[in-house]
Amino acid sequence: MYEQFGIPGLQAYKKTVDYCKSKDLVVIGDIKRGDIGSTSAAYAVGHLGHVQVGSKKYAGFDEDFATVNPYLGSDGVKPFIEVCKEENKGLFILVKTSNPSSGEFQDRIIDGRPLYEWVGEKVAEWGADHMGKEYSYI
């Protein structure tokens, strides 16, 4: 919702994230990003990581978690996983969404199973490699 207001909206979003963090709240950026590798890497750093400019590091929006769309494949998700590992952050990866038309693609049967089940298995694979004490950060 913030993005519809352009730069002032993004500034308000950053202020909202910072305010929530000042209250020790966990911030989930419901950004649903998913793109080719290099663009996903930029999104991942911008939302969850730090960017190096000269000798100084700057945080972007600095959410604790972000939502990611995996439907472009692993090269669109792996940059987020790498940043999460470096920054001790987490992801919620879309598998089956609740919007009315989600079934147009997500419910398609592939080898006897809906696509979202295949996606869920892949997300579980990614998560298995990144377990914390009790759960995966993916």
Residue map of PLM features:
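N-terminal active-site wall of soluble small-molecule enzyme domains
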Residues: 1-59
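Conserved anion-binding
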Residues: 35-138
